[in-house]
């Protein structure tokens, strides 16, 4: 009886110790698992936080770089537009008055020397361009005259428009002509003529030259003057200017 009781108690003690050991091991295991889970959760939290930090930082960095690039581009565009507006304002600035006149309806007998002599009355001529035919070397019916001053060109238009030269009515107007292109095209530049300063000064300043060179003849209408060359000039070359 005692033996059976002792065996039963020993069995109970063994079972109790086993239960305590299992409980401790389960507790430790659970604690370790929870600690491991805690560390794992903390690790993933750290990675997510770093990812979140990087994700939140990288767009801002990109946006900052993009904004800086955009601001740089916008500033460059603004400077370009300002320069462009400045150049356009310069190009739109008031230009100088035109000093070039166009003389049309010339007879083929008229030469550049005749034009320089007649139109030199009204001012200092800087350049004359008269296109001519290569074979006949006669003019094509018009010429450009560039004066030194714009008021002289206006005076020539006022006096010589609708005037007669060699029996034909002239049509004189102020026009723009690209004289700079003549220097590039030498063939056309050969047809140009530039009076010397001595000729300009003598024709423009010496009024007695015109009085002796041209003789007053007859008047077709009241208030109009007809002047023609004297016997020293070719008989075909006569001109009548407006009063």
Curated annotation (Swiss-Prot):
Residue ranges with Low complexity bias: 57-92
Region of interest called Disordered, as start-end residue ranges on this chain: 48-92, 189-243
CDD domains on file: RRM_RNPS1
Keywords assigned by UniProt, alphabetized: Cytoplasm, mRNA processing, mRNA splicing, Nucleus, RNA-binding
GO terms for MF: RNA binding
Residues of the RRM domain: 99-177
Basic residues bias locations: 210-219
Self-association and partners: Component of the active spliceosome.
Family: Belongs to the splicing factor SR family.
Its job: Putative component of the spliceosome which enhances the formation of the ATP-dependent A complex of the spliceosome. may participate in mRNA 3'-end cleavage. Also mediates increase of mRNA abundance and translational efficiency.
Protein name (record): RNA-binding protein with serine-rich domain 1 homolog
């Amino acid at each position: 009886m005692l033996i059976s009781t002792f065996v039963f108690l020993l069995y109970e003690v063994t079972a109790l110790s086993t239960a305590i050991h299992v409980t401790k091991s389960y507790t430790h295991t659970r604690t370790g698992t929870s600690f491991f889970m805690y560390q794992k959760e903390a690790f993933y939290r750290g990675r997510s936080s770093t990812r979140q930090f990087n994700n939140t930082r990288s767009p801002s960095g990109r946006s900052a770089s993009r904004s800086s690039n955009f601001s740089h581009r916008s500033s460059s565009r603004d400077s370009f537009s300002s320069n462009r507006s400045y150049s356009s304002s310069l190009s739109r600035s008031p230009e100088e008055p035109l000093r070039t006149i166009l003389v049309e309806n010339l007879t083929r007998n008229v030469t550049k020397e005749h034009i320089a002599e007649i139109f030199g009355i009204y001012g200092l001529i800087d350049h004359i361009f008269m296109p001519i035919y290569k074979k006949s070397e006669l003019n094509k019916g018009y010429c450009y005259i560039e004066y030194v001053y714009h008021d002289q060109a206006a005076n020539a238009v006022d006096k010589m428009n609708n005037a007669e030269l060699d029996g034909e009515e002239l049509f004189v107007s102020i026009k723009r002509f690209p004289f700079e292109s003549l220097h590039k095209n030498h063939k056309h530049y050969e047809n140009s003529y530039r009076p010397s300063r001595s000729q300009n000064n003598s024709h423009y300043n010496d009024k007695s030259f015109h009085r002796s060179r041209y003789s007053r003849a007859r008047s077709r209408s009241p208030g109009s003057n007809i002047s023609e060359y004297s016997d020293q000039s070719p008989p075909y070359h006569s001109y009548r200017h407006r009063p």
